[in-house]
């Protein structure tokens, strides 16, 4: 009985330790048109690899900024789409040691 309780306690401590190492990462950036004007309400999606399931998503602000809070570590593709412009796909590898990832300014190209 003592071994069972000790084993269960060890399992609980290990599980809690694993969960405490999962950090929330904030992904942010700015989206502009090729004229350098902000891409207002552009769609920003964070797709989890390998199956491209949407993990998070938002629309850009009036200034073209976006923030995706509470993202967990992993491999992703950041997809940015906006009517009249070509979609952009940016690979992201977010590590557990990271708390924030700024992808910078993304310039969208006009869809001819």
Placement of each model-derived feature along the sequence:
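A short, solvent-exposed loop/turn motif at the edges and junctions
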Residues: 48-53, 75, 79-91
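Bacterial Sec-dependent N-terminal signal peptides
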Residues: 1-30, 76
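Structural motif
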Residues: 28-39
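Short Pro-Gly-centered beta-turn/loop motif in secreted/extracellular proteins
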Residues: 37-40, 67-75, 83
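Glycine-centered loop-to-beta-strand initiation motif
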Residues: 29, 60-68, 106
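Structured interaction patches on ligand/partner-binding surfaces of diverse proteins
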Residues: 85-103
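Short, acidic Ser/Thr/Gly-rich low-complexity loop/linker segments typical of extracellular
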Residues: 49-65
